[in-house]
Amino acid sequence: MSAPENERRGSARLKVRVPVEIYTEGSAAPLRGATSDLSLSGCYIESIFPFPVGTPLELKLQLEGTLLVVATVVTSDPQVGNGIHFTRMLPEDIEELRTFLENAEKTQ
């Protein structure tokens, strides 16, 4: 990853697949997907039907527990997926994600 991307993102992303449930405003049921990379500040979710940039989302990331994340779509790649920026997480969820990422980095 180049330095400008790291600076723009704020934290390095790891190639890791994590199941995710995606909720949009007014949705009765979640969409299900998986991350292709993940960091403390965001992720990339693969999807053939990506959301438009600016779409607010609520995510449930399935790590050892379930993390609840409020997020916003920052990139939209047709037939590929979305870049997601995390905008709000509970402190304990941040710590669980940090621990998960540290352990994942050791195995890569």
Which role fits each region the language model picked out?
Residues 33, 69-74:
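Short beta-strand-centered aromatic/proline hotspots
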Residues 22-24, 37, 73-77, 88:
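A residue-level detector for short acidic-glycine micro-motifs
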Residues 1-40, 98-108:
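N-terminal helix initiation/capping motif
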Residues 11, 46-50:
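Short, surface-exposed secondary-structure edge patches
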Residues 56-62, 95-105:
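Extended Gly/Ser/Thr-rich low-complexity repeat segments
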Residues 27, 50, 64, 78-79:
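Short strand-connecting beta-turns/loops that link adjacent beta-strands
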Residues 18-24, 54-67:
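Short conserved beta-strand and strand-loop elements enriched in small hydrophobics
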Residues 44-47, 79-88:
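Short, solvent-exposed secondary-structure boundary/capping segments
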